[in-house]
C-alpha cells in the first residue's frame, strides 16, 4: 500500500486510506458533507494494479533491450498521488490548493450531477461551447449557454439547470438526450448498465463455463484486440476441491484427513 521504503512501508492500510494520504480525498467530495467514500477501489485498481501492469511491461521492454531485469516497487499511495493530474499541476505550478467543489471537474462548475423529478440522476459534462449550446437548447433555455463561460455565474447556471432537470422525469430526460450530442448521460444502476445497448454491444459481460454444462456471468476483459479477445475458460473450483491432494502432499494420511474433515477443519 505504501511502498517498500519510507516510514510507512510496514503500515497497514486500505483503499480509502491511500486516497486520503495522497490528497485525492481532499478535493473529491462536497463542501457540506466532506470526502466521498467511493464505490470503486480507485487506489487498488486504477492506482496499484494498472500502474503495476504498465511498470511490468516497461521492465520487459527494458530487459529485451538491455538484458537486465528489474525489481518493481509499486505503491498504491504513490500511484494514487499521481492521479492528482490536473489538481496537482495547478498546485505545484501556481500554488492553487484544490478543495471540494472549487474547480471545474469536482463540482465547482455546472459539470455535475443533477436530480430528476422522480429522484434519479443525470450526468452533465457539456464543457465545450458546442455541447453547452446543445444542452441548453434541449432544455428550452438557450440563453443559459452564455453563463457557462463566466466562472462567477456558475452557481446561477447550476441552479437554473437543476430547476430544468427537476421539471422532467428520468425517462423523459433519457428520451430527450438520446438523440442530442451534449455529453449528458443517465446515472444507471449496475443492472441497468448490464442491459444498456452500448455496453451489451461492447460485450462487457462474458458467460464462463462452470464445468457442469452451465455458465456463470462475469465481468469481461474490457480490452479489444484486433487478433481476438482473451476468453476465460472456467470459473475456478469450489473451496476445498483439492483439500485431499494438498494434505497428502503435506504428509497427512487418509485416516488423519478424514478426522480433519469430520472436525470441519477442512472441507
What are these regions (language model features)?
Residues 105, 110-184:
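Aromatic-enriched alpha-helical interface/lid elements that frame and gate functional surfaces
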Amino acid at each position: 500500500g505504501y511502498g517498500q521504503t519510507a516510514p510507512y512501508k510496514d503500515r497497514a492500510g486500505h483503499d480509502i486510506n491511500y486516497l486520503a494520504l495522497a490528497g485525492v480525498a481532499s478535493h473529491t467530495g462536497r463542501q457540506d458533507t466532506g470526502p466521498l467514500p467511493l464505490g470503486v477501489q480507485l487506489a487498488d485498481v486504477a492506482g496499484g494494479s494498472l500502474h503495476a501492469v504498465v511498470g511490468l511491461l516497461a521492465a520487459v521492454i527494458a530487459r529485451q533491450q538491455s538484458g537486465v531485469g528489474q525489481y518493481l516497487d509499486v505503491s498504491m499511495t504513490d500511484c494514487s498521488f499521481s492521479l492528482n493530474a490536473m489538481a496537482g499541476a495547478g498546485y505545484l505550478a501556481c500554488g492553487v490548493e484544490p478543495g471540494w467543489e472549487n474547480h471545474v471537474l469536482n463540482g465547482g462548475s455546472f459539470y455535475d450531477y443533477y436530480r430528476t423529478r422522480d429522484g434519479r440522476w443525470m450526468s452533465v459534462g457539456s464543457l465545450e461551447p458546442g455541447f453547452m449550446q446543445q444542452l441548453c437548447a434541449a432544455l428550452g433555455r438557450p440563453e443559459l449557454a452564455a453563463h457557462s463561460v463566466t466562472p462567477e455565474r456558475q452557481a446561477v447556471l447550476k441552479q437554473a439547470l437543476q430547476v430544468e432537470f427537476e421539471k422532467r422525469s428520468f425517462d423523459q430526460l433519457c428520451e430527450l438526450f438520446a438523440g442530442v450530442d451534449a455529453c449528458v448521460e443517465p446515472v444507471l444502476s449496475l443492472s441497468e448498465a448490464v442491459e444498456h445497448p452500448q455496453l451489451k454491444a461492447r460485450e462487457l459481460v462474458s458467460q464462463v463455463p462452470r464445468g457442469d454444462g452451465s455458465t456463470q456471468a462475469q465481468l469481461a476483459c474490457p480490452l479489444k484486440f484486433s487478433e481476438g479477445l482473451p476468453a476465460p475458460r472456467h470459473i475456478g473450483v469450489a473451496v476445498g476441491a483439492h483439500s485431499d491432494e494438498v494434505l497428502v502432499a503435506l504428509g497427512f494420511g487418509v485416516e488423519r484427513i478424514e478426522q480433519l474433515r469430520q472436525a470441519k477443519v477442512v472441507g
